[in-house]
């Protein structure tokens, strides 16, 4: 039995039409194959060099967990990159219309959390779903968290969600 479902920065509609989608759709659908050879060549680097490259790429993060670095090293695998890019290309093609029927059927169990500067699901999407479902638990981030919060704000997000779900957790 599902008590609650939390949709964080939900990419549930019009992905290819979002600002980031307009940029990424051609790359993901047509040019993704061009990345396979460079990734294949980088896969031969020693693990320490890969970790250094990841740290360099993530240097702008305010905090970066060692787990983010360890996980990001998987991006040097051709199989991993091929699967990621294929899945992302399919999302651009298939995630088009919001499933309002399913949302309406489960509205009392859903929490939506939208970002103010999210280029994957812009604030316009928040405004529209809030208008369509005024009784829903649909929130707009006031903390400036970004879509890729797992890279630098996972603890902050976890604490926030724990607060939201406190009543549900006492029922278990």
What is each model feature region?
Residues 16-21, 124-125, 153:
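Short aromatic-enriched loop/helix-cap "lid" or pocket-rim segments at secondary-structure transitions
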Residues 44-86, 97-98:
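Conserved alpha/beta-hydrolase catalytic His-Asp/Glu region
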Residues 108, 127, 131-172:
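Catalytic active-site module of serine/aspartate enzymes centered on a nucleophile-bearing elbow/loop
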């Amino acid at each position: 039995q599902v008590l609650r479902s939390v949709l964080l920065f939900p990419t549930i509609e019009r992905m290819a039409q979002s600002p980031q989608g307009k940029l990424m759709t051609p790359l993901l659908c047509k040019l993704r194959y061009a990345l396979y050879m460079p990734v294949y060549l980088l896969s031969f680097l020693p693990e320490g060099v890969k970790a250094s490259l990841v740290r360099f790429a993530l240097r702008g993060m305010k905090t970066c967990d060692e787990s983010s670095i360890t996980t990001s090293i998987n991006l040097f695998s051709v199989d991993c990159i091929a699967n990621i890019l294929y899945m992302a290309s399919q999302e651009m093609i298939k995630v088009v219309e919001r499933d309002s029927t399913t949302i309406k059927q489960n509205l009392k169990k859903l929490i939506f959390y939208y970002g103010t500067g999210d280029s994957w699901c812009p604030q316009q999407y928040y405004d529209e779903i809030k208008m369509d479902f005024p009784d829903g638990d649909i929130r707009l981030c006031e903390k400036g968290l970004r879509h890729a919060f797992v890279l630098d704000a996972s603890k902050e997000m976890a604490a926030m969600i724990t607060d939201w779900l406190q009543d549900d957790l006492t029922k278990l």
